[in-house]
């Protein structure tokens, strides 16, 4: 038995994206000289980013030279996959005499993010100084292969010298691939913060009423000027 071809349905197209339910139909051909026995076809995931919902199909004997459709196998893609992560399966075909196995793999489309620009509005020198309260504005681009519906944002840190306020966004509905959002939040720096002190804050990117979560790191350095941190990705 030879894996001849396959077709899939994922959402509204044939591109597999994060958190989608997918149906996969296989065409198998009997390239032998004799009719096969009763066949069992099983699609077995080899990666942890996919969950089978319909993994096994039984097929009547296949005559020599015939091609039959098997499926549709059904599976769900994990919500939290990286853009272009690979999902890998083994298709196991067995009759009463012998078995065959074929690898099948796909890449998954998902959002991904890049900091395009950042600004500090402090009414002064454009840097985060000890004892100062400033507004940080970030332009974040979706550089991935999929859009994010109803994006949500949280910002937090775990640092004794910094305190971050609530974050706001100019887009709460649909963040398409290749487009940007503008994020703003208030940051206060302790009077005791030493110049040059560095910390990592995090932007938690989510999607409303889903389990989607992407942690975007945001380095912060006290006393660094705009023209320096833009080059080095520091605030």
Predicted feature locations:
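Buried hydrophobic-core signal for structured, non-transmembrane domains
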Residues: 24-29, 65, 89-91, 136-141, ...
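Extracellular carbohydrate-recognition regions
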Residues: 219-235
């Amino acid at each position: 038995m030879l894996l001849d071809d396959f077709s899939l349905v994922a959402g509204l197209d044939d591109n597999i994206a994060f958190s989608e339910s997918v149906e996969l139909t296989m065409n198998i051909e009997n390239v032998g000289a004799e009719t096969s026995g009763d066949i069992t076809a099983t699609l077995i995931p080899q990666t942890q980013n996919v969950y089978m919902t319909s993994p096994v199909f039984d097929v009547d004997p296949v005559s020599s030279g015939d091609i039959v459709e098997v499926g549709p196998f059904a599976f769900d893609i994990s919500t939290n996959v990286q853009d272009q992560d690979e999902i890998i399966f083994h298709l196991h075909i067995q009759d009463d005499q012998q078995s065959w196995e074929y690898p099948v793999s796909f890449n998954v489309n998902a959002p991904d993010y890049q900091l395009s620009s950042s600004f500090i509005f402090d009414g002064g020198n454009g840097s985060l100084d000890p004892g100062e309260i400033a507004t940080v504005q970030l332009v974040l681009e979706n550089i991935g292969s999929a859009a994010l519906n109803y994006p949500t944002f949280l910002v937090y840190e775990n640092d004794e010298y910094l305190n971050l306020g609530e974050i706001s966004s100019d887009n709460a509905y649909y963040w398409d691939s290749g487009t940007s959002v503008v994020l703003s939040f208030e940051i206060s720096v302790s009077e005791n913060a030493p110049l040059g002190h560095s910390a990592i804050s995090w932007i938690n990117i989510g999607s409303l009423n889903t389990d989607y979560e992407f942690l975007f790191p945001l380095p912060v350095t006290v006393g660094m000027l705009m023209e320096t941190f833009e080059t080095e990705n520091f605030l």
